[in-house]
Amino acid sequence: MNIMAHLIPVKCSRFLAGIIVSLVAGPALAGEINTGYFGDVAIKGYDPVAYFTMSKAVKGSEKYSHRWLGATWHFSSPEHKKNFQVAPASYAPQYGGYCSDGVAYGQATANIDPQAWRIINGKLYLNYDPGSAQELEEVDGQLEKAEANWPEIQKKLAAK
């Protein structure tokens, strides 16, 4: 039995799935990546993949950077950069990296703390501070409010 004959289709299907997710989610995020008040670096230079693979906030390096949706994303390793390049929408924070709890209140709060994060249902949510992250996770309906408010906030951000 040729094991490579079985592995190649699996690798290709994961790659294609990543491409499809990026194509579908990319337009929804286009132009809406929070880079703070100055510069063009997403998540204040933190590695978006590390939240998923290491379960912690890890500062990325300019050495491993990638441009996506008008922002520069930093990574802590070449592997994390590659993972992101294959499926960026799988790792990018929800609501363009704006404070998720703020979005629940109808506000696009640009100042986030990369240490104040949650992964809920396989998605990354960044917040202004640890209290906001806790509120997003623990208050019933908070995430649903954010989901409902995000389309209107996107329109306002696009109009700026």
Regions found by a protein language model. Give the residues of each.
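Bacterial N-terminal signal peptides that target proteins for export
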Residues: 2-19
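Charged, low-complexity intrinsically disordered segments
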Residues: 30-160
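Generic low-complexity segments that are intrinsically disordered, proline-rich and/or Lys/Arg-biased
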Residues: 7-10, 28, 152
